[in-house]
Amino acid sequence: GIDRSDPETWDDDRWPTAVHGGILPSHGIGHSAAQWYIRDRAPVKQAFAAIWQDEDLLTSFDGVALWRPWTRHGHWRTNNGPSWMHIDQHPIGRPGKHCVQGLVNLLTTSPACGGNVMVPGSHKRFAAIPELYPERLARIHPSIDHFRFPNDDELLAGTEPIICHLEAGDLLLWDSRTIHCSSPGLETPSFNDQLFRAISLVCMMPKSKSNDKVIAKRRAAVENLVSTTNWSDRFINADEFPNVVEASKVTTFKLPPVPELNKNQTELVG
């Protein structure tokens, strides 16, 4: 297995399936004790409740992002920021404000290690995207909430992206219409025996945005250790991502135990 204190155990054969940006979305991670602990922290729920002006929330069953030190193995380096600037909301399928995403930062960031990159104010130009990319959007089903921008996109011109410096324990929230990504730093870290980045992904949305059918699936997901995306008003199974399915054909991962939830956590399930 993987030993946090021994980088020799972080090899590709043992490391869980990762998707863009070093996100580990599946294999039961969404129901690990660590993820449920973070969702149960009062300040996390209070932040989302303040945004939505609603205390009755549903949590995502999101995973985490862990960056292995690419000073150790170059192919561990994650996507450079300009290569995958994106939004996580379909401009036609979901116009307007629908979701505020979040993460709890677990390791203090640095210019060398990198982190989240945001284009300030870009959510205000979200409504213009269908006119700029009618052909591309026509090929993307309205239920697919991931849209990438080319490096020379006019929506990226004139506004300097910012990289978010976060202390351990900080909560970062952003509107899903915001153009963003994550990126390694511009400098070379001086160490190769520690994780460069560790975050817990968390998103909470009002229960009123969902429905009984989705909530029934969510309850079953807890028992079956099924992780999801950030959209807690719908049910999107992260274990069905194509690269996760392919990895599961050749590798068996030990899943965490079924969580024993307290009252607050159970309410966040629905």
Locate predicted features.
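Secondary-structure boundary elements
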Residues: 49-58, 92-97, 105-113, 125
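A short beta-loop-beta micro-motif enriched in histidine and acidic residues
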Residues: 53, 86-99, 159-160, 166, ...
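Short, structured patches in soluble enzyme cores that scaffold and shape functional sites
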Residues: 68, 87-89, 100-108, 118-120
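Non-heme Fe(II)/2-oxoglutarate
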Residues: 131-134, 168-173, 177-270
